[in-house]
């Protein structure tokens, strides 16, 4: 039996993750109190069915040590994965504004504003996030994108495959929090300064044609691919479930998008499990 414990920030997508796991054949339980986790697992262990449980901030003990002790005990007996759903404050504020729901911590203390509740929850959950096996950042992702991310990561972990995630971003929006490697490509020639190219993105042919005229772009693409290829065997031997490579330019529209797409396709063509995301483009589409 395999157990996935789903936790994370309220509004970051725990319910979405649980629905995906249910579709993958997991027996799912929402908002299970931590003190019942061990007994629940023992009660279903003979069924041999994979199980997923979500733990809400209100069900986490005040002393996280109690939760860690329970998880360590279960890990000694079962194949246990802790999946943590993360999102930045801007995304969480937007989601709560759209759904008009009340944050769980605000229910317990009506003196807390939404902003304060989010910050308090981040502080409480920090140790749990640090010990999670999978951390997924849902900032700016649609329900479909998040569902696909969860599915790929979980299925990849079940097959013991390394899932390679390539994401482009804009430095003006901040660094991605889930990246293992970050490449800054702001020194490359910028199509933004060509009026005819400015409205396009790195996914468009004319942008690719412009960038491929410059040897520096081709050299950097080759060097990033070579760097990852060199160390990939050791990363796979280290029992990693996923590798996230972030490539950033100023706005996340042209240079980083082009390189992320091409490098992701390079590794996909070699048979690796690859997911490609363009975070700033997704953000701009929503805006």
Swiss-Prot record:
UniProt KW keywords: ATP-binding, GTP-binding, Nucleotide-binding
InterPro entries per the UniProt record, alphabetical: P-loop_NTPase, RapZ-like, RapZ-like_N, RapZ_C
Positions that bind GTP: 56-59
Signal peptide location: none
Positions contributing to ATP binding: 8-15
Family: Belongs to the RapZ-like family.
NCBIfam families: PRK05416.1
Job of this protein: Displays ATPase and GTPase activities.
HAMAP family, sorted: RapZ_like
Protein name: Nucleotide-binding protein VIBHAR_03667
Organism ancestry: Bacteria, Pseudomonadati, Pseudomonadota, Gammaproteobacteria, Vibrionales
